[in-house]
Swiss-Prot record:
Taxonomic source organism: Salmonella gallinarum (strain 287/91 / NCTC 13346)
GO biological process, one term: phosphorelay signal transduction system
Residues that hold ATP according to the record: 215-222, 278-287
Name used for this protein in its record: Anaerobic nitric oxide reductase transcription regulator NorR
Annotated positions of the 4-aspartylphosphate modification: 57
Function: Required for the expression of anaerobic nitric oxide (NO) reductase, acts as a transcriptional activator for at least the norVW operon. Activation also requires sigma-54.
């Protein structure tokens, strides 16, 4: 069997029929798998020494969420280094990145693999991978024929990346005009809700508007801020982060605006605040709903006039800063309750964005699970970490009250449990490795404390009880530290310090 002119023409026609890049990529991959009669095919984008799946056929859905680093996948590294078709023998010692990821063949290893590097000029931009369980599957196809397929795929991918670059305004007036793929922002998801959010980010990123990012705790609001910054003309300048919930009232003004030597006890030198650090760049204010009304008034002045005053200084400093703010509160309700200034709310919410909760993102759960599985594989030095079909169904059926952050922790915990019960460096996550419950945990009681393992002394007993109290408060408040601090009737900064001392956070 070989490629006829009709077959190549058919592939080219399928590329033109697609509506949007994603549809074209999927048509290409599906057609190739049919023509080559192989078990799996994938189109990957190359960026920063890793391959990012764009379209797959015949592979588990979570592959779309994985990020394949060259260091962790020797076959993909060989493809990246090659300038031509790469054929891996059936007895190759190099592990295949898709072992265990072909549905119905999870227990078997891939026997035939072909890699086609894709170039735009001299720049590697991606790869096509073709896999089969039959060792001789690709021997009937000549390298010349596979090169033609690679050329068609490279053209489609190059055009898509160039259009994406232009749409996101990375090709700015005065730039070199050289093709540079946009940096990965780790915003993984193909659900309608995430697709809409990405479109809105593209719209607002190129402007200089302030943006208010809303959403539940753990949904990934910081990633949205990073994506906005990376897609803006300010991307070459700093993105400065400040968690307003972790700021004690006594130092909040200094953190935002800086101070001069002698402004207060302990001010032994001049210090720049976050606004100065973010000059000509972007300042991301997380948990902005936790700021006091007094600080809200000072923040409003900066947004109105573009100048700041360091604590203890009468002089004003001009700053050029774009502000991105995030909150898990309903700020409209906070305004009505008198806890948030209406004028500041309107200044910040010129272009509001909402990050959807994970329960509204459908199959994105599986893609994100694949991403975290690959992270765990690299971190623990495992050859593979895969989800069983039962585990995938289990993850899809759960409501994820803690959103993406809860999913990340669940995957990491499941990998550790599965690794402990299985010899070797291959881990398959089963349903029983996930202890998921949407029930609200009860507050710790004296009985639960007495049921803890016996401790050696009073200090250890006290620390164990504090640890349990903090865990329960975080669980009841969706891992929101500010809300947990209020529930425990303590200052959020003190709670962070105590949790760090007790080993509950890095």
């Amino acid at each position: 069997m070989s490629f006829s002119v009709e077959v190549l023409a058919g592939i080219a026609i399928e590329l033109q029929r697609g509506i949007g890049h994603q549809d074209r990529f999927q048509r290409l991959i599906t057609t190739l798998r049919q023509v080559l009669a192989c078990d799996a095919s994938a189109l990957l984008r190359y960026e920063s020494r890793q391959f990012i799946p764009l379209a797959i056929d015949g592979l588990a859905q979570d592959v779309l969420g994985r990020r394949f680093t060259l260091e962790g996948h020797p076959r993909l590294e060989a493809i990246a280094r090659a300038g031509d078709v790469v054929r891996f023998p059936a007895d190759s010692d190099l592990p295949d990145p898709y072992d265990g990821l072909i549905p119905g063949q999870e227990s078997l290893k891939v026997h035939a693999c072909v890699g086609l590097p894709l170039f735009a000029g001299q720049n590697l931009i991606g790869a096509l991978t073709l896999d089969a369980m039959t060792p001789e599957q690709f021997e009937v196809f000549r390298d010349e024929e596979l090169r033609l397929v690679a050329a068609l795929a490279a053209g489609a991918l190059s055009n898509a990346l160039l259009i994406e670059q232009l749409e996101s305004q990375n090709m700015l007036p005065g730039s070199s005009g050289v093709f540079e793929p946009i940096k990965e922002t780790h915003m993984i998801g193909l659900s309608p809700a995430m697709t809409q959010l990405k479109k809105e980010i593209e719209i607002v990123a190129g402007s200089d508007l302030n943006v208010l990012i809303g959403g539940e705790t753990g949904t990934g609001k910081e990633l949205v801020a990073k994506a906005i910054h990376q897609g803006s003309p300010r991307a070459v300048n700093p993105l400065v982060y400040l968690n307003c919930a972790a700021l004690p009232e006594s130092v909040a003004e200094s953190e935002l605006f800086g101070h001069v030597k002698g402004a207060f006890t302990g001010a032994i030198s001049n210090r720049s605040g976050k606004f100065e650090m973010a000059d000509n760049g972007t300042l991301f204010l997380d948990e902005i709903g936790e700021l006091s009304l007094a600080l809200q008034a000072k923040l409003l002045r900066v947004l109105q006039y573009g100048d700041i005053q360091r604590v203890g200084d009468d002089r004003s400093l001009r700053v050029d800063v774009r502000v991105l703010a995030a909150t898990n509160r309903d700020l409209r309700e906070e305004v009505l309750a008198g806890r948030f200034r209406a004028d500041l709310f309107h200044r910040l919410s010129v272009f509001p964005l909402f990050v959807p909760p994970l329960r509204e993102r459908g199959d994105d759960v599986v893609l994100l699970a694949g991403y975290f599985c690959e992270q765990c594989r690299l971190r623990l030095g495992l050859s593979r970490v895969v989800l069983s079909p039962g585990a995938r169904r289990h993850l899809l059926n759960y409501g994820w009250p803690g959103n993406v952050r809860e999913l990340e922790h669940a995957i990491h915990r499941a990998v550790v449990l599965a690794r402990a019960t299985r010899a070797g460096d291959e881990v398959v996550l089963e349903e029983q490795h996930f202890a998921l419950s949407e029930d609200v945990l009860p507050a710790p009681s004296a009985e639960s404390f007495l049921a803890l393992p016996a401790c050696r002394n009073l200090r250890e007993s006290t620390e164990n009880f504090q640890r349990e109290m903090i865990r329960q408060a975080l669980a009841q408040n969706n891992h929101n530290w500010a809300a947990s601090a209020r529930a425990l009737e303590t200052d959020v900064a003190n709670l962070h310090r105590l949790a760090k001392r007790l080993g509950l956070k890095d």
